[in-house]
From Swiss-Prot:
GO molecular function annotation: arginyl-tRNA--protein transferase activity; leucyl-tRNA--protein transferase activity
EC code: 2.3.2.29
Pfam annotation, one family: ATE_N
Superkingdom of origin organism: Bacteria
Protein name: Aspartate/glutamate leucyltransferase
One GO term (biological process): ubiquitin-dependent protein catabolic process via the N-end rule pathway
Gene behind this protein: bpt
Organism name: Variovorax paradoxus (strain S110)
UniProt GO cellular component terms: cytoplasm
Amino acid sequence: MTHLKDLPLHTLQFYATAPYPCSYLPDRQARSQVATPSHLIHNDAYSDLVLSGFRRSGMFTYRPYCDGCRACIPLRVLVNSFQPSRSQRRAVKQHQNLLARVLKLCFVPEHYKLYLRYQTGRHAGGGMDHDSIDQYTQFLLQSRVNSRLVEFREALPDGTAGALKMVSILDVLNDGISAVYTFYEPDSSAGYGTYSVMWQIEQARKLGLPHVYLGYWIEGSAKMNYKARFAPHELLIDGRWQAPSDFTR
């Protein structure tokens, strides 16, 4: 069982937010449980928090704490037994010409412009398509844990890096990689999002890490339901990571 009382987190405090409109399910109210203070949430503490279903947005570490709703279920891919589907293998083949460069978190104007194009093309009207540089920085480039920025560029004929196509933010935890956020050229047919997850699974394998944490799976949300296509995976139900076949609503 993975409960907060069992973890070495006695120095942290937890509070519940007031209700706010749910970002994923229409006509629902959401609440979050927030871990504070942020300066004490180092990589070991955050790794433990992720085991209990927490995520981070910048310096904000939270998990769903909604009244009467359990739709947001943490999901992690089992790296060593992962079996890609035909469409996932196709995404890897389609983007085998991308060159990945792993960086520390840093602001690059070209990344920010791609972020705005992505928000406008894929999530127009969602409130993030007009994010300022400060908002972008607070959301993606602030972290007290072991975070990385990965940029993916198209390879030119001479093997050098060309046009920017995608950026992924990830955290390297004690037992896996946590996918924070990915944005890319908003071409709906390109399969960049699938390729990003496949790349992170392969990176976890190279690092000897058994899991890739994809955040919350929400069965009724088209934006989140795709995560269940990466199999085998486990869901965090009632404090225990378990196979989907063991879970009955």
